[in-house]
Amino acid sequence: MNPKFKNNIGIMVPEILMPAKNVDLTKWACVACDQYTSQPDYWNKCEEIVGDAPSTLRLMLPEIYLEKPGETEKIAAIRKAMHDYIDNGILQNLGEGFVFTRRSVGGNTRNGLVVALDLECYDYSKGSTTLIRATEGTIVERIPPRLKVREGACLELPH
């Protein structure tokens, strides 16, 4: 993150990395790691669909696997995939900027903006009044294993 964009509103300009044009986006896209946490069949099907193709599935640890056998190996594989995707041009650096998003669900359109959040302005505690706060309850027990995934990671992924 470029310090010249630091401010007092908790938002910073991110460096944008996007998949290369030859990446199959139907295999690239994946739901957030905290979804389907009690449905191993969902994640097994994702693995089957993705196969060996580049995918965000390789860049995050679905929470269903937290604190389970093989977690350490999965985290090492995530870090390796991050480096491989950068080194081999699977991820293309578009520079600093924002990404405007638009999605339609059930006939309603939602617009969004991908930004970088200053985590110094974040608090997940219930009743927090910080600039950036959780929109849903945080399961505190999941924070340490999530941090293990982020330690030494060369990428931060939007959620």
Kindly give the residue locations of the regions a language model identified.
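A cross-family signal for N-terminal binding/gating loops and helix N-caps
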Residues: M1-H159
